[in-house]
């Protein structure tokens, strides 16, 4: 069995001809994007970073790929339980052969080929959800439908970029509304917001800072534009770009302009840059910076790796504050400092990134015998 590529037109026919009973669509995008807008009847495959890291592009258990027990049992039946096709999609990839090894779509495809030796054919949707939803919005569902009156008004508009505005009834949550003001000269939004010239003109935006994998040419001819390519991955190094981004924002501010910082969804990478800017220039603590931005753009959710880098950045640029009750032992402190700090944050902030493996939270056992301690007369920890 092999993976076959298909376009949106063919998927649309399959959904109509086969109905949902004969075609299973597996959406490998993050749950936030899936919950906001998805192919009708599709299932979300939400593989966490630990599973992806261990898989390294290889196969994982079917229970990770198909969390829905009924769907899993049916597909694993002899002959696929009557299912003729399993379609895998991500946000916008055009070729499954070029998928990154650590991508969820790559792991899902490999796993399906391993567990479905016979039965349903495995397909990959070219162009991903972005292309399909722009072509066939009637085959998709959105969590936040917009009133018919507003929809009819939007349909009659043309953007200043010369392209028709897509039906906003199927726009993901992170693209709803417009860019938000973080500071009088600093705005935060998504790639969609950055592509809409009317948004930029209304807010008097003079510069764009793109922190995503792909550069953009839309509406950039008359704007000061900077592109910092960063993956939205817990292993990506974003902190090395903090100063570069801060310098660019300050340059725009000094010239009396306004800058829109964006990535793909305006959820992880660009909010991380904005938090770093607040921490550096306003001396905000990480908790303060996160809550400040969360109040203005509720969908922000930096990944766990970015939060760790922001925490490290805080320790480098801001004076340390004494903790009221330090850990009782140095070994305990070494294993729990980072997690303990995050657990003191607000509930919203704790839920904003991936769940850390619970094994890290467990105390580290000490197997070696403890020799007599020769304590310094100057600094003696009485709690150990």
From Swiss-Prot:
* A molecular-function term among this protein's GO annotations: phosphatase activity
- Judged by the first EC level, this protein's enzyme class is hydrolase
Q: Which GO terms describe its cellular component?
A: cytoplasm; nucleus
Checking InterPro entries in the record gives: Dual-sp_phosphatase_cat-dom (IPR000340), MKP (IPR008343), Prot-tyrosine_phosphatase-like (IPR029021), Rhodanese-like_dom (IPR001763), Rhodanese-like_dom_sf (IPR036873), Tyr_Pase_AS (IPR016130), Tyr_Pase_cat (IPR003595), Tyr_Pase_dom (IPR000387)
Locus of motif Nuclear localization signal: 53-74
- The record places the active site at 263 (phosphocysteine intermediate)
Q: Which residues form the Tyrosine-protein phosphatase domain?
A: 178-319
Alphabetical UniProt keywords:
Hydrolase, Nucleus, Protein phosphatase
Q: Which reaction does it catalyse?
A: O-phospho-L-tyrosyl-[protein] + H2O = L-tyrosyl-[protein] + phosphate; O-phospho-L-seryl-[protein] + H2O = L-seryl-[protein] + phosphate; O-phospho-L-threonyl-[protein] + H2O = L-threonyl-[protein] + phosphate
- Gene Ontology biological-process annotations: endoderm formation; negative regulation of DNA-templated transcription; negative regulation of MAPK cascade; negative regulation of vasoconstriction; peptidyl-threonine dephosphorylation; peptidyl-tyrosine dephosphorylation; positive regulation of cerebral blood circulation; signal transduction
What superkingdom heads the lineage? Answer: Eukaryota
Q: Which Pfam families match?
A: DSPc, Rhodanese
**Any keyword DNA-binding?**
no
Q: Which PROSITE patterns match?
A: RHODANESE_3, TYR_PHOSPHATASE_1, TYR_PHOSPHATASE_2, TYR_PHOSPHATASE_DUAL
Where does it live in the cell?
Nucleus
The set of disulfide-linked cysteines is: none
Q: Which residues form the signal peptide?
A: none
Rhodanese domain: residues covered: 19-141
EC number, as in UniProt: 3.1.3.16, 3.1.3.48
What is stated as this protein's family in its record? Belongs to the protein-tyrosine phosphatase family. Non-receptor class dual specificity subfamily.
What's this chain's function?
A: Dual specificity protein phosphatase; active with phosphotyrosine, phosphoserine and phosphothreonine residues. The highest relative activity is toward ERK1.
Write down what this protein is called: Dual specificity protein phosphatase 5
Record the organism. Answer: Rattus norvegicus
